[in-house]
Curated annotation (Swiss-Prot):
Protein name per the record: Autotransporter adhesin UpaG
Gene3D superfamilies reported for this sequence: 1.20.5.170, 1.20.5.2280, 2.60.40.4050, 4.10.80.270, 6.10.250.2040, GSPII I/J protein-like, Serralysin-like metalloprotease, C-terminal
Signal peptide (UniProt feature, chain positions): 1-53
Homology family: Belongs to the autotransporter-2 (AT-2) (TC 1.B.40) family.
Domain remark text: The signal peptide, cleaved at the inner membrane, guides the autotransporter protein to the periplasmic space. Then, insertion of the C-terminal translocator domain in the outer membrane forms a hydrophilic pore for the translocation of the passenger domain to the bacterial cell surface.
One GO term describing the cellular component: cell surface
Function: Mediates aggregation, biofilm formation and adhesion to a range of extracellular matrix (ECM) proteins, such as fibronectin, fibrinogen, laminin and collagen types I, II, III, and V. Mediates adhesion to human T24 bladder epithelial cells.
Chain spans, region Translocator domain: 1690-1778
Length: 1778
């Protein structure tokens, strides 16, 4: 390519200049300080002083004044470069009176002064006094070490301080002042912006006239003010004037300590108050106003919602337009109102206007204090699902429908009389049908009962039968009462009559048993009288019968003594003869009697039949034995003949018995003279190893049969056995034999005590295997043992020491203990995350607990935020009272309060609805109507009690009335004679002890067999008197009706009853309770045996015996019953005392199993109870040695102090959250294996840090909202970010990215125009159009890094690449250039490619070193070195040129392509296009080319054409000659037609055996085998040649061509030309290029023959048409015009770039601010967040709202941002996580 010029930067003129292509260029420097320094240095060097600085290595060059030193330079009048401390300091002074006194210092400029070591002073009167300080600007001063002062009168006094801007001041250490008159006074304070002021330590003022007057304060925005410690003001005119106050937004004010105002014109003036929202206001301590126009004006007040108002202390207004005006009030809902103190309004439009009132529900209102309303006068609501309230005299609980129903139902049931409960809860009318009438209420019924009952007479102390005017009255229809010693039943007349008719009456001398017409009669039902020596009781027939029976029995037994019966004395004297007496001689009792040596002993009780028993046996026992003997008789039929004589049988038994033969030591079957005999009828004996049974013949027969069978089988084996015996005998020596001593098989052999056992098959290796194992198995085991031994040996020391370092089981604690050494507690680290499931027993690690704690902390924060609201809500809500187990309507200081507007609840047995007053009134009204007695209910619900008159006394309630009747029924149901349903009779029990009582005024009842009348005392007295008279013995009737004991004197004895008297008469002792010396094991006892058979009998009337440890009294049945009853009651479990005194088994149900005794129940309880384990110090839930569940556990309280057990559902709920958190943790944590951590570093998914070999230094994010990621990363300021090892972000919102990066600079906010002056070039900026955040630093002072692989920026605030910057700078100049102009209003040109040039509107050059000139010209990125000149020209290929409107390159450089008429492959370096495929243009005024690669003009081509014409004529002539030749050849052909193909003539030879030639066309010639001349006048020469066109000669075919060689150069126009002629012709011509297929490419012409050199086209006329070539003059003029236009556009572009840069920076700041917004992360949580960002001098503020779905899967985010450029942006996103 012919590159004739290039554009380079001229530092002298400060502009880009067109220069020769060989000129060298450094390009324009981009840095400000470098640009300024370059300008200053260049200005100094080019001054009129004419000084020069050569490169000396020896003595310095002195062009000014100063003392000598090594390496110093002083240039300028009065300049001094003097090092006081070191003569080799190499200081430099340039300029008038410039002084560089510091070591290695530089003073450049008039009267500059640099006294600090390595200091630099640039500018008139600039002073750099501190070491390594820099002062840049007229009169700038850098006093502090390492400080920098940039700008006119800029000044730095502090260490490493920085002041940039006119009159800026950085006074304190590490301070930054950036902006005109910006001032930063205290340590690390920052002032950015014109007149910005940061006067306290760590303060930051960002923005014009911003002020940060408090320590750690931040003022961000124009005229923002943060005057107190820790205060923050963000926004124009924002103000935070108290400690820790925060004001964010335009004109916001945070005036109170710890207050916060966020939103336009919001104000938080109270301490710790918060105002969020446009014009929101929080004016008192702890007040919170959130929402547009919200106001919280009292202490602790909260207003949440647009235009909400909280004007009462501790009040909360929540909802749009809500208002809480009362103290401690709560308004919850849109337009809700809570104006009463302690009032609550919940719901849209709800209003609680009165004190301590509660309005719940939309539109609910209260009109009275201390009430709860769930509706209003027009709208009522039910309270449903309400638990039953407590019912007591102190209860204030609300009662639900089911309770009211239960009460009504119980009243109806107690009232009886058909009363029921109506659907409205009232009790229906009662109806009592009494004898005196039907009554419809209790009072009337009681009155009716009172007049007709048997009343108690207190005076008489008895029931009185008087009624009306009659003093005495009968009691009729009295059932027969029980007559017994303890009976207190009334007896009726018939009983008394029967008694009189059947009584044993006294006839004057004795009781007469005469009855009716019978002179004598029986006395029946006589209780057995006492039979004692002094008894006078009458004896009954049974007693006498017993006596008589005994007498009869005795008579039989002592028949021999009947003669002695007549004389009792003789009988007594002869008693010894009839007694069973001891016979000393015989040593036994003797039954001899009289002359009989033997006699019977009768009535003998059955004796014990045991081995040790000495009891006599009676006949029945012997009878049983005899019966058994008789039964056995049939079994010994062979001895029947011997039965008649037992003695003989017994004597002969020895001969017939199977007797033991001592000699033989066995039973012998010998019998008589036979030595042997059969034993028949032998039962088959057991055939077992241990059986000793005899076997019978059948068994032996079976055995013999088997033996016979075996004998046959054995016979065949006998020989073998014989042989085997020998073998076995010999085998003993070679066998593995059992060693009894060793108890094992022995491998001993011969004289060897041990020997091998070979060929042993591998035995089974199982727990129960007894197989022998072989050597290979043992080898494997030994190898394993050896391996294990080695491992164990290696582990021994570790194991020995492991005890101290292991997590061991602590038996006492029942758990693993982490105690270590002397420390009772220690950490357990590297614990893998445990499973968090309901049944998990895994240990959890700190991260899991940390996550849980973080979640808890988050929840705690959320809960804390709600605590006050909930607390207030609890005060005003209908809340659950745990102690009472119910909802409580207590409110404020009132223990009780109303619940109003309550809809009527459902009344049923299972209703839990609350009941309102009208329902209770209805029930009470119905109840009072049924109570009667004047009971009533007032309109206020007050019940007036009934009045019942009972017995002349008034009673005001049913209970007292019933009690009165009960005192008269027992006082009339207490004094009434009532029916005892249990006893089935009327009971006269009375009083609190139910003692029997007297019934007085009883008229004489009828006495007859059918009478059921009650008998009065006089009637009974008459009977008793009669009986007493009949008894005699001085018996009389006592005052209580009893009869005194009679006295009978009989046989010298005194008896007090008839029985005793009769007993005295009785001469026998058979009925007495006698001593039995044989009883009680021979120790003797009284025997109650009675009667002939001496059967056991009852002893009645036994008095209660003493019950004590020493008592030996007899105990009666009642005592035993009482004891058993007590035991049964104590046992419980439905145990009862049976009629026989036994106790039924109790039933205890434990764990759904019944147990019938205490022991089993206790065992079951002990096995199934949750018992205390002393060792574990806890309840042990193990069962059968295994851990077991505890079910049905109520949910325990969850609090920090709770010790309640928690149930599975609670833990499951926690586990679900933990699981969700665990999943989130696992997703974050990633691979936590040690190997992975060692290889990849510790961290979480996608975030890793490898701290191997580094001391532990955690990241620190101490700033509010700060983030630090990386080893020892530090983010110490608010919202700062530090990422990378040792990275530090120490400025608010600053970003330090990369290891060792430091972000400590606050970006300047302000404006400045770009200017060029004698002091140099000042690059302008405008940072006021957006919020400025902290700088992004990717390095540190002296430590830099590149940002590589940055994509080209496309938006205003995008980062730009070096390529873009170079192209932008290289494409334009900052000042106009002469002879270069452009006139257009279209978009500017853009030179993107490196070293590229773009001239013209809309022209874009993307290719490196490309040139684009013209309107909308394009050079593609791939078209390196491409040139497009002309409107819409396109250079699409590298090293190619498109020239002219619409011209395009279409192929570019080609390699090895086939050129037209060229045999050798050709190469090209590019393409020159002056048109396009559908639009070509001429190249005119082309000079005649001379070189091989020159273009040729039409004139040259005409010469060639003339030559071609001449050649054509020569060819025509040749054709004529050929035609003539054809004729001759034809003649020859005809002449030689008969010549064979292989024949020849003298001058014509062929050598072929192919096909014949074929001349088909007229006058055609075909010569050669297979040649064809098909067309007229055609010639085909050569084998296979084809001539198929007229007038042509073919030397080949379409598929087989031939050259015609040795062609002489043609002369005539029709002569053939040879290649050399054609080359000569083409050498001087310009040809079109050829396409890849060899065709001519009329769109391309290659000059210079395609060689690497270039060709000039001279004398080119100025192009006129769009497709004409342009000459150099035209191009030069175009370039000049383009340059002029470009310079103009460059100025405009510079401004646009500046603005674009600002907008891009603002956009980046917005993106960073939105990126920095935190988001909610716990399920169901929401978050409102604020963030800030700054980039390249621009800043932004972002607000966001985020929420997480309840299941934690979905996350939604909405965020918006505004920046200092006044632009707004928003983003919306949603995501799902798994």
């Amino acid at each position: 390519m012919n590159k004739i010029f290039k554009v380079i930067w001229n530092p002298a003129t400060g502009s880009y200049t067109v220069a020769s292509e060989t000129a060298k260029s450094r390009g324009k420097k981009s840095g400000r300080s470098k640009l300024l320094i370059s300008a200053l240095v260049a200005g100094g060097l080019l001054s009129s002083f004419g000084a020069s600085a050569d490169n000396y290595t020896g003595q310095p060059t002195d062009y000014g004044d100063g003392s000598a030193g090594d390496g110093w330079v002083a240039i300028g009048k009065g300049a001094k470069a003097n090092t006081f401390m070191n003569t080799s300091g190499a200081s430099t002074a340039l300029g008038y009176d410039a002084i560089a006194e510091g070591e290695y210092s530089s003073a450049i400029g008039s009267k500059t002064l640099a006294t600090g070591g390595a200091s630099m002073a640039f500018g008139v009167s600039a002073k750099a006094m501190g070491d390594r300080s820099v002062a840049l600007g007229a009169s700038s001063v850098a006093n502090g070490d390492r400080s920098m002062a940039f700008g006119r009168y800029a000044k730095t006094n502090g260490f490493t301080s920085l002041a940039i801007g006119d009159s800026s001041l950085a006074d304190g250490e590490k301070t930054i002042a950036l902006g005109n008159t910006a001032k930063a006074y205290e340590i690390m304070s920052i002032a950015l912006g014109d007149n910005a002021n940061a006067s306290k330590e760590y303060a930051m003022a960002l923005g014009a006239s911003s002020k940060a007057g408090g320590a750690d304060s931040l003022a961000f925005g124009r005229k923002s003010t943060a005057n107190s410690t820790g205060s923050l003001a963000i926004g124009a005119d924002s103000s935070s004037s108290n400690d820790n106050a925060i004001a964010i937004g335009n004109k916001t004010q945070a005036l109170g300590v710890n207050s916060m105002a966020l939103g336009n014109a919001s104000q938080a003036s109270g301490e710790s108050s918060i105002a969020l929202g446009n014009t929101s206001e929080a004016s008192e301590q702890n007040a919170i106003a959130l929402g547009q126009g919200s106001i919280a004006s009292k202490v602790n007040s909260i207003a949440l919602g647009s235009n909400s108002l909280s004007s009462g202390e501790n009040a909360i207004a929540l909802g749009e337009g809500s208002a809480a005006g009362g103290s401690n009030s709560l308004a919850f809902g849109s337009q809700s109102r809570a104006n009463g103190n302690d009032s609550v309004a919940i719901g849209v439009g709800a209003a609680a206007a009165t004190d301590n009132s509660v309005a719940i529900g939309a539109g609910s209102t209260t009109d009275a204090s201390n009430t709860v309303s769930v509706g209003n006068s027009a709208t009522k609501r039910k309270i449903v699902n309400m638990a039953a309230g407590a019912i007591s005299n102190t209860s204030t609980d609300a009662i639900n429908g089911s309770q009211l129903y239960t009460i009504s139902d119980s009243v109806a049931k107690r009232l009886g009389g058909g009363a029921t409960v109506g659907s409205d809860g009232t009790v229906t009318a009662v109806s009592y049908a009494l004898r005196s009438g039907t009554y419809n209420n209790v009072g009337d019924a009681l009155s009716g009962i009172d007049n007709n009952t048997l009343q108690w007479n207190k005076t008489a102390g008895a029931f009185s039968a008087n009624h009306g005017a009659n003093a005495t009255n009968k009691i009729t229809n009295v059932a027969k009462g029980t007559v017994s010693a303890t009976s207190t039943d009334v007896v009726n007349g018939s009983q008394l009559y029967d008694l009189q008719q059947d009584a044993l009456l006294w006839n004057g001398t004795a009781f007469s048993a005469a009855h009716g017409t019978e002179a004598t009669s029986k006395i029946t039902n006589v209780t057995a009288g006492n039979l004692t020596a002094g008894s006078t009781d009458a004896v009954n027939g049974s007693q006498l019968k017993t006596t008589n029976d005994n007498v009869t029995t005795n008579t039989t037994n002592i028949a021999t003594n009947t003669t002695n019966i007549t004389n009792l004395t003789d009988a007594v004297n002869g008693l010894g003869d009839d007694s069973l007496l001891w016979n000393k001689a015989a040593g036994a009792f003797s039954a001899a009697h009289g002359t009989e040596a033997t006699s019977k002993i009768t009535n003998v009780t059955a004796g014990n039949l045991t081995a040790g028993s000495t009891d006599a046996v009676n006949g029945s026992q012997l009878k049983t034995t005899n019966d058994n003997v008789t039964t056995n008789t049939t079994n010994i039929a062979t001895n029947t003949t011997n039965i008649t004589n037992l003695t003989d049988a017994v004597n002969g038994l020895g001969d017939d018995s199977l007797l033991w033969n001592k000699t033989a030591g066995a039973f012998s079957a010998a019998h008589g003279t036979d030595a042997t005999s059969k034993i028949t009828n032998v039962t088959a004996g057991n055939l077992t190893a241990g059986s000793t049974d005899a076997v019978n013949g059948s068994q032996l027969k079976t055995t013999n049969d088997n033996v016979t069978t075996n004998t046959t089988n054995i016979a065949t084996n006998t020989t073998n056995i014989t042989n085997l015996t020998d073998a076995v005998n010999g085998l003993g020596d070679d066998s593995l034999l059992w060693n009894k001593t060793a108890g094992a098989f022995s491998a001993a052999h011969g004289t060897d005590a041990t020997s091998k056992i070979t060929n042993v098959k591998a035995g089974d290796l199982t727990a129960g295997s007894t197989d022998a194992v072989n050597g290979s198995q043992l080898k494997t085991t030994n190898d394993n043992v050896s391996t294990n031994t080695t491992n164990i040996t290696n582990l021994t020391d570790a194991v020995n020491g492991l005890g101290d370092d292991s997590l061991l089981w602590n038996k006492t604690a029942g758990a693993f203990s982490a105690a270590h050494g002397t420390d009772a507690t220690s950490k357990i680290t590297n614990v893998k995350a445990g499973d968090l499931t309901a049944g998990s027993t895994d240990a959890v690690n700190g991260s899991q607990l940390k996550t849980t704690n973080d979640n808890v902390s988050t929840n705690t924060t959320n809960i804390t935020n709600l605590t006050d609201s909930v607390g207030d809500l609890k005060d005003d809500s209908l809340l659950w009272n745990k102690a009472a187990g119910a909802f409580s309507a207590a409110h404020g200081t009132e223990a009780t309060s109303k619940i109003t507007n309550l809809l009527a609840g459902k009344i049923s047995s299972n209703s839990t609805d609350a009941i309102n007053g009208s329902q209770l009134y209805g029930v009470a009204d119905s109840f009072t109507s049924y109570l009667g007695g004047g009971a009533d209910i007032s309109d206020t619900g007050v019940l007036s009690g009934p009045t019942y008159t009972i017995g002349g006394t008034d009673y005001t309630n049913v209970g007292d009335a019933l009690a009165a009747i009960n005192t008269s029924f027992s006082t009339s149901l207490g004094d009434a004679l009532l029916w005892d349903a249990t006893a089935g009779k009327f009971s006269a029990k009375h009083g609190i002890n139910n003692a029997p009582s007297v019934i007085t005024d009883v008229a004489n009842g009828a006495v007859s067999s059918t009478s059921s009348d009650a008998i009065n005392g006089s009637q009974l007295y008459g009977v008793s008197d009669y009986i007493a008279d009949a008894l005699g013995g001085n018996a009389v009737v006592n005052t209580d009706g009893s009869i005194t004991t009679p006295t009978y004197a009989i046989a010298g004895g005194s008896y007090n009853n008839v029985g005793d008297a009769l007993e005295a008469i009785d001469t026998t002792l058979d009925d007495a309770l006698l001593w039995d010396t044989t009883a009680n094991g021979g120790n003797g006892a009284f025997s109650a045996a009675h009667g002939k058979d001496k059967t056991a009998s009852v002893i009645t009337n036994v008095a209660n015996g003493a019950v004590s440890a020493t008592s030996n009294d007899a105990i009666n049945g009642s005592q035993l019953y009482s004891t058993n009853k007590y035991i049964a009651d104590a046992l419980g479990g439905d145990a009862e005392v049976n009629a026989d005194g036994t106790i039924t088994a109790p039933t205890y149900t434990i764990a759904n199993t019944d147990y019938n005794n205490v022991g089993e129940a206790l065992d079951a309880l002990d096995n199934n109870a949750l018992l205390w384990d002393e060792d574990a110090g806890a309840y042990n839930a193990s069962h059968d040695g295994n851990a077991s569940k505890i079910t049905n556990v109520a949910a325990g309280d969850l609090s920090t102090t709770s010790t309640d057990a928690v149930n599975g559902s609670q833990l499951n709920a926690t586990n679900i959250l933990v699981t969700q958190n665990s999943q989130m943790i696992n997703q974050l944590a990633g691979n936590t294996s040690e190997t992975y951590i060692e290889e990849n570093g510790a961290g979480i998914n996608y975030v890793r840090t490898n701290d191997s070999g580094l001391a532990f230094n955690d990241a620190s994010a101490s700033g509010i909202g700060a983030t630090a990621v990386g080893y020892n990363a530090v983010a110490s300021h608010a919202s700062s970010v530090a990422i990378g090892q040792d990275s530090i972000s120490e400025v608010d919102t600053g970003i330090a990215l990369g290891s060792s990066s430091v972000s400590s600079r606050v970006i300047v906010k302000g404006t400045r125009n770009t200017s060029v002056s004698e002091e140099g070039v000042v690059i302008g900026y405008d940072t006021t159009d957006g919020e400025l955040l902290g700088a992004l630093s990717i390095g540190d002072d002296g430590k830099y890094r590149q940002i590589i692989n940055v994509a080209d920026g496309s938006e205003a605030h995008d980062a730009v690449t070096v390529r873009q910057l170079q192209n932008a700078i290289g494409a334009v100049a900052t000042t106009p250039t002469k002879y270069y102009h452009a006139n257009s209003t279209a978009e500017d040109s853009l030179a993107v490619g490196e070293d590229s040039l773009a001239m013209g509107a809309k022209t874009i050059v993307n290719g490196n070193a490309g040139i684009g000139i013209g309107l909308n010209t394009l050079v593609l990125a791939d078209a390196i070195n491409g040139i497009a000149i002309g409107s819409n020209a396109r250079a699409n290929h590298a090293d190619s040129i498109a020239m002219g409107n619409g011209s395009q390159t279409t192929r570019g450089a080609q390699t090895n392509y086939t050129a037209y008429n060229m045999d050798a492959p050709q190469n090209s370096v590019g393409e020159f296009s002056v048109g396009s495929e559908d639009g070509q243009r001429q190249i005119t005024n082309v000079a005649a080319g001379s070189a091989d690669t020159d273009a040729v003009n039409v004139g040259q081509l005409k010469v060639t054409d003339a030559q071609v014409s001449q050649n054509t004529q020569s060819i025509t002539n040749l054709n004529t000659q050929v035609t003539n030749l054809d004729t001759r050849v034809t003649n020859i052909e005809n002449g030689i037609g008969d010549i064979v193909t292989t024949g020849s003539t003298k001058y014509f030879k062929t050598n072929t055996d192919g096909a014949d030639a074929n001349a088909q066309g007229k006058d055609s010639v075909a010569i050669g085998s297979g040649s064809i001349a098909a067309a007229d006048n055609s010639v085909a020469l050569g084998t296979g040649s084809v001539a198929d066109e007229e007038n042509t000669i073919s030397v080949g075919s379409s598929t087989n061509q031939r050259r015609i060689t040795n062609v002489a150069a043609g002369v005539n126009a029709t002569d053939a030309v040879n290649v050399s002629q054609l080359k000569s012709s083409e050498a001087g011509g310009v040809r079109y290029d050829t396409k890849a297929d060899g065709s001519i490419d009329y769109s391309n012409i290659t000059l210079g023959g395609g060689n690497s050199g270039t060709t000039r086209i001279s004398n080119v006329s100025a192009g006129v048409n769009n497709n004409d070539a342009v000459n150099y003059a035209q191009l030069k003029q175009s370039v000049q015009e383009t340059k002029q236009y470009t310079d103009q556009r460059m100025v405009e572009m510079d401004n646009k770039l500046s603005k674009t840069e600002s907008k891009l920076s603002g956009g980046i700041a917005s993106a960073m601010a939105m990126t920095g917004l935190p988001q909610a992360y716990t399920p169901g949580a929401s978050m409102a967040s604020i963030g800030g960002g700054t980039y390249n001098g621009e800043s932004a503020v972002a607000l966001g709202v985020s929420m997480v779905s309840a299941n934690g899967r979905w996350v939604y985010k909405l965020q918006g941002s505004t920046n200092s450029q006044g632009e707004y942006s928003a983003a919306l996103g949603a995501g799902i996580q798994w």
